[in-house]
Amino acid sequence: GVISKPFFALSDTVLQVFCCRFADRIGKGIRGAPRDALIATVTPKDVMGASFGLRQSLDSAGAFIGPAIAALLMWLTFDNYRLIFWCALIPGLICLSLIIFEVKAPEPKNAHRTNPISREAMGRLSSAFWMLIAAAAVFSLARFSNAFIVLRAANVGISAAMVPLVMVLMNAVFAFSSYPFGKAADRIHPIWLLTLGIVFLFASQVTLALASSPVWVLAAVVLWGLHLGATQGIFSVFIAKLAPEDLRGTAFG
């Protein structure tokens, strides 16, 4: 992810930008599972929900603070895209330095390493885990791209200049709700929070379908952010609790 940022700034063609974006997404795919497995390993079980909620909250905060800073820099630099990508390299380097020099991963309890994707290893993942994965897959089918929310906002009369703020609102609600929902998962069964998240999703979709004014679209966006806050971190909590410790990376992947 960090390596791709300078190449974005140096790109001159659509193909080059596509390759940079592809590399950036590969980086995101590689880092996601180890990050969550590390969080699950170093976090006490009684605050697992709060830990994943905080992680999701900070991630979501970056999703709206970063674009907001980029928009400000674009305005100050008269749309200097290359400078924006060079600036985007700075937080990535800071993060990489923290991981290399400050984050200390605990040594595995079992020194004997086995193939985590073997049939034997997969058999150690419980039926409850596979039911969770199936539920997550079905849940994903009920969701649509955020791009459709933006299109719906424009469709009901929100101006082009204000449309990006729709996503800022959604990510803000997502960020501020993730930690409280995660903390709640340490006190009540996470299944109730997942159920609440599905209710929020259903309410948001119905509101978007029936909305006839910007106010209703914004209400739907708030509900969408709440559904993300009530579900994204909670799925991680479930996986951390259901997967054997030495297979958490595989389970999160």
Locate each region found by the language model.
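Transmembrane alpha-helix termini and helix-breaking/packing motifs in multi-pass membrane transporters
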Residues: 65-85
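Intracellular juxtamembrane helix-capping segments at the cytosolic ends
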Residues: 30-43, 230-243
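C-terminal membrane-cytosol helix-exit motif in multi-pass small-molecule transporters
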Residues: 89-110
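Helix-loop boundary and gating motifs at the non-cytosolic
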Residues: 129-166
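Glycine-rich segments within core transmembrane alpha-helices of 12-TM secondary carriers
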Residues: 53-68
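Juxtamembrane intracellular "pre-TM" segments in multi-pass secondary transporters
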Residues: 105-135
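Structural signature of the two symmetry-related core transmembrane helices
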Residues: 1-6, 89, 192-207
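Helix-to-loop junctions at the C-terminal end of transmembrane segments
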Residues: 74, 177-189
